[in-house]
């Protein structure tokens, strides 16, 4: 019996060549609507779906393949005598190949002016039903949903006269991944349209960006996936201009650096190691900002990741070239800067839009047996809601330093303390189990520079000991959330030493 293929695609990439190859193998081709028209325009002889179903396409094409003659031909188990007898009795013929991809729902809802009606109209019904039927019966039916698989299928047909069982199984698995992702996009879109923030079930879909050499450590396997609608201002959507492939740790660190540099509107440079900032500088231009970021911690920046929110120019590139760095990420690089930096063959250069995230972004964190979902911490300092409980208010320069430190401290692993002075960080205390421990680390790193600096804490002071350490180091201004039952103790110490202290009312834990 002659084999038959059903072809109905929205992505018409390579379909003419593929169908030509099927016809050359003696396979009869059934097609629908726009696909049939395209194939016939290219001189290929195909059978219309209505000739198989005995029923016209109706309701603007909504109903065309949902018919027993189609699904019987797909689902019949060919070595089951009852199935074969029923097919013969009903005049059905088997379908051996299904080449279908679905209505472009993802592309439709990505359009800024899409209407709800347009989105609904691009929900495919017949397509998923066909490919699921074919995939279920993959022992007898080859189902192709991705043009990338056309060549593999044709090659096996030419060599063996049929598609290998292993290939059929892989194609079937791909179908169910495809339909699962498709349905996830639809369910998430409808959930968002209803304004439902915490649905009873959460279905997420990600697309593979690349396999990684290994994970956090060489013995761990890893892969990088991107969200279908991730913000373009992200590592997932960055363009790599030069250097080795990104590693798992590179991606984590670049993400951290990018998150911090987005906090600034003025020219800024951030240096990151192990997902914590080791140096942050701002300036009148990117060269000055980098100089300050470097001077913030010239030891830790070695082997680090750099993020800048302005184009990297030649002068800055020459300074960057002087030390070993893993990654430089920026909106762009001048031609001269690229010539300088590309002389280091392993240095990864990435370009990406620098846009501050919104609260609509969701952060997913896996835990054993589950998943935590929360809004990204995008809250900025609101000067209209702050309070100053101390006798002295910050000076203009202290305010400047406090704001810089506060922007940075929210991105440091808790317990977090950041010292800033003269448009740069000078000390970072991260990830300690007690707050005063982080303060001591930051103060030690700052050394004499701590005199006259500003301190930011990601959470309140449970004891006045951090303020006492700050006073000993000559720190003159502090910004913290406040809210401890012992706030008065910290205020009293601050007043004793003439320290200005600001309460924000907002905590910025980061774990």
Curated annotation (Swiss-Prot):
It catalyses: (6R)-10-formyltetrahydrofolate + 5-amino-1-(5-phospho-beta-D-ribosyl)imidazole-4-carboxamide = 5-formamido-1-(5-phospho-D-ribosyl)imidazole-4-carboxamide + (6S)-5,6,7,8-tetrahydrofolate; IMP + H2O = 5-formamido-1-(5-phospho-D-ribosyl)imidazole-4-carboxamide. Gene3D superfamilies: 3.40.140.20, Methylglyoxal synthase-like domain. Residues 1-145 form the MGS-like domain. GO terms for cellular component: cytosol. PROSITE patterns: MGS (PS51855). GO terms for biological process: 'de novo' IMP biosynthetic process. Transmembrane segments: none annotated. Pathway: Purine metabolism; IMP biosynthesis via de novo pathway; 5-formamido-1-(5-phospho-D-ribosyl)imidazole-4-carboxamide from 5-amino-1-(5-phospho-D-ribosyl)imidazole-4-carboxamide (10-formyl THF route): step 1/1; Purine metabolism; IMP biosynthesis via de novo pathway; IMP from 5-formamido-1-(5-phospho-D-ribosyl)imidazole-4-carboxamide: step 1/1. GO terms for molecular function: IMP cyclohydrolase activity; phosphoribosylaminoimidazolecarboxamide formyltransferase activity. It comes from the Bacteria. The IMP cyclohydrolase activity resides in the N-terminal region. This is Bifunctional purine biosynthesis protein PurH.
């Amino acid at each position: 019996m002659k084999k038959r293929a059903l072809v109905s695609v929205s992505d018409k990439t390579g379909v003419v060549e593929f169908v030509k190859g099927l016809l050359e193998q003696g396979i009869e081709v059934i097609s629908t609507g726009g696909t049939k028209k395209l194939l016939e325009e290219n001189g290929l002889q195909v059978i219309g779906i209505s000739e198989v179903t005995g029923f016209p396409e109706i309701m603007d094409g909504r109903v065309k393949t949902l018919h027993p003659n189609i699904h019987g031909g797909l689902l019949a188990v060919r070595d089951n005598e009852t199935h074969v007898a029923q097919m013969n009795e009903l005049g059905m013929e088997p379908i051996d190949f299904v080449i279908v991809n679905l209505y472009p729902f993802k592309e439709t809802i990505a359009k800024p002016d899409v209407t709800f009606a347009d989105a609904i109209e691009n929900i495919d019904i017949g397509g998923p039903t066909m490919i699921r039927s074919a995939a279920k019966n993959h022992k007898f039916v080859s189902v192709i949903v991705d043009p990338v698989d056309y060549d593999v299928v044709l090659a096996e047909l030419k060599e063996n006269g049929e598609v290998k069982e292993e290939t059929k199984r892989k194609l079937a698995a791909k179908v169910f991944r495809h339909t699962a992702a498709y349905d996830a996009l639809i369910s998430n879109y409808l959930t968002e349209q209803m304004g439902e923030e915490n649905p009873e079930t959460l279905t997420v879909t990600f697309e593979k960006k690349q396999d990684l050499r290994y994970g956090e450590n060489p013995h761990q396997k890893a892969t990088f996936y991107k969200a279908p609608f991730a913000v373009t201002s992200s590592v997932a959507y960055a363009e790599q201009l030069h250097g080795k492939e990104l590693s798992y740790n590179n991606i984590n660190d670049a993400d951290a650096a990018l998150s911090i540099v987005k906090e600034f509107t003025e020219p800024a440079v951030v240096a990151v190691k192990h997902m914590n900032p080791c140096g942050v500088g701002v300036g009148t231009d990117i060269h000055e900002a980098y100089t300050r970021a470097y001077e913030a911690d010239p030891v830790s920046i070695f082997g680090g990741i750099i993020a800048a929110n302005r184009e990297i120019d030649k002068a800055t590139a020459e300074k960057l070239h002087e030390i070993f760095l893993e990654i430089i990420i920026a909106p762009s690089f001048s031609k001269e800067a690229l010539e300088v930096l590309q002389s280091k063959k392993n240095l990864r250069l990435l370009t990406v839009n620098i846009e501050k995230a919104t609260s609509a972004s969701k952060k997913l964190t896996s835990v054993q047996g589950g998943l935590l979902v929360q809004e990204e911490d995008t809250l900025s300092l609101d000067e209209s809601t702050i309070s100053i409980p101390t006798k002295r208010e910050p000076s203009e320069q202290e305010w400047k330093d406090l704001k810089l430190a506060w922007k940075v401290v929210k991105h440091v692993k808790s317990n977090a303390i950041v010292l800033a002075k003269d448009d740069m960080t000078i000390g970072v205390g991260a990830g300690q189990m007690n707050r005063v421990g982080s303060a001591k680390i930051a103060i030690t790193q700052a050394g004499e520079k701590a005199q006259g600096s500003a301190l930011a804490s990601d959470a309140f002071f449970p004891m006045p000991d951090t303020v006492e350490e700050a006073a000993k180091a000559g720190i003159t201004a502090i910004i913290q959330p406040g809210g401890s039952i012992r706030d008065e103790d910290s205020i009293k110490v601050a007043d004793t030493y003439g320290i200005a202290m600001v309460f924000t009312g907002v905590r910025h834990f980061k774990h």
